[in-house]
Amino acid sequence: MGKLIKLITTLTVLVSLLQYCCEFNSGSISCERTQTLCHYTNPRVWNTYFSRNCELYKNKVSPGFDIVARKYDTAVKPVIDDATVKVNKVAIQPAFKVIHSQCKKWNCGKYYQLVRSPMVKTRRFFFAKYNAFVKPNLDKFFTAEFRSHLKERILKYKNIGHYYFTITSRCIKSKYDFIVGNTEEKLMGKFKNKDTHGIHGSVTREPSSEDMVLTVSTMESDEEELTTTSTQTVVETITLDQEEASAVANHAHDDEASTDVEGSTDVNVNEQALLQEDFDMWSETILQKTQDVIQLFEKDVSKYINGKLVEEANHFKAKFQSLDDKSKKFFSKISLAINDIECVEGIDSETGKKIFFDKSGSTEISQYITRELVREYFNETRSTLDELTNAMEKDLSEITDEIEKKVNAIREENVEVFEEWGDIIVNEWSKRMAYVDVINAHMGADDDTTLDEEKAKSSVNWKKFLKGKKQIIESRDKLAHHSADLSRVNAFRQKVQKKILSFTQESGEFLYILRSKANLQFQERERKERERKEREKAAAEEFQRQQELLRQQEEEDEEDVSYTSTSTITTTITMTL
């Protein structure tokens, strides 16, 4: 079980590295097998295949795969790309410089085969492109007469080259047999097997004096046997080529149009074969191009959103800091006012006006704290904080709209790129198919069966062409309606809104606490003022009562003095009498 897990882990790592290399070098992979390997090890390709062919997979597995793919593209891939760039800059490039400086001294002759292999692949690639795009255009300028003369010259120089090649090959084999081995037999076999029709039946003459030159310098029996074989091959080839040359000349003089039809038939067959092969790959090419454009769109959107959110996160951080500072300033102002509610009244000795001190009596305050003043402070704080939070919400909404507009612009740009690519592809394909139809209509084969087959192939190709064109249109609509991943934008917006709501709730609760504290302070001050007034009133009443009692006592004293005076006068009068 442990070995199986290790094997699965190793395969997973290898496939992941292969896919990363394929994606990183998607534009520079020229090997068809490598492209095929990259294609059939791509999880996205299999996901698309199973989604089209399995309804259960499409409903149950594909949505989860899409989520994982988006998370990889947005969270993992950027980190890997950055790490790759850093490693390439720090380690790989310096290492390549050192290796390059050492490789300058190497002799690369022994690596000929390593260089030859990609050159052969490149030659095959250009040859295929030549047959597909260049050769049809060249055939338009080469008439039948020109082709016949050109073919005669080619056959002539081919015979001469064949003759000298045989001599050179024999000399090389005689001197470097231990290196060359059986190269001559292989090469001569290619020339001999190139066209064996009618060779044995057409050779009737003996070797000429020119041909016998090849056997003059033979010294051993094995060399003589080999030389005889080579001479016979040359004679057969020359005889065949002369017959072909005479036949071509007769055709050129007798019927110029028949040669044109013959050449065009070959072109037609090649074009039909190429169309059949290319149509099989066209659908897959469109799907791959669609996936590439979608990946490019998601990559551009992810890159833009990352930069935009980082920038706006810094801006909102500064805004929240400013909001926090202003709120603390307002809260401090209200707290000082609440502390000064319980103030001490005094009289200015110079002006005689009332002045007020804090409850300790050591610091003079600017004004007497009233309910109206504190209420004004609360209203100012609440309105200012509401304006700031509303402005932040408005900015957040504008940022979201800006991101959506930019994403739509990126989508439209990628759709335009795909449309341009599709127009070029459709235009090129229509030209190729129209060219093949012209060949079929004007220079086709005389055989009715072959002509019907070509017409049937042309009809099938045009249907495939129409199907591919519709597929391009459907892919364009898919790109136009492909939804971007705005989850990070929504998360950022929710985070900011949550923080604004949290600040609003906290500031509201703190203002409520300050308001309650202010009410308690005012109630305490009003209670003390009522008690003071009651005491003053009671003291005034007591003072008035004392004054009344004092007045009454004075009146009673005055009455007593009057009575005493009257009694004295009466007594005096009586004694006098």
UniProtKB/Swiss-Prot annotation:
Look up the domain of life of the source.
Eukaryota
Give the observed phenotype of the deletion mutant.
Answer: A combined deletion of the OSW7 and SHE10 has reduced dityrosine incorporation in the outer spore wall.
**Biased composition, class Low complexity, residue ranges:** 564-577
One GO CC term on file? ribonucleoprotein complex
Coiled-coil regions, chain positions: 379-416, 513-562
Region annotation Disordered: where it falls in the sequence: 525-577
Q: Which GO terms describe its biological process?
A: ascospore wall assembly
Positions with biased composition (Basic and acidic residues): 525-545
Q: Where in the cell is the protein located?
A: Mitochondrion
Sequence intervals crossing the membrane: none
Leader sequence range is 1-23
Alphabetically sorted, this entry's keywords are: Coiled coil, Mitochondrion, Ribonucleoprotein, Signal, Sporulation
Family affiliation:
Belongs to the OSW/SHE family.
Spell out the subunit comment: Component of the mitochondria-localized RNase mitochondrial RNA-processing (RNase MRP) composed of one single RNA encoded by the NME1 gene and at least 31 proteins. Absent in the nucleus-localized RNase MRP (NuMRP).
As for what it does, the entry says: Involved in spore wall assembly. May be a component of the mitochondrial RNase MRP (MtMRP), a ribonucleoprotein endoribonuclease involved in the cleaving RNA transcripts to generate primers for DNA replication in mitochondria. Causes growth arrest when highly overexpressed.
Q: What else is known?
A: Present with 8640 molecules/cell in log phase SD medium.
Indicate what this protein is called per its UniProt record: Outer spore wall assembly protein SHE10
Q: Which organism is it from?
A: Saccharomyces cerevisiae (strain ATCC 204508 / S288c)
Q: What is the lineage of its organism?
A: Eukaryota, Fungi, Dikarya, Ascomycota, Saccharomycotina
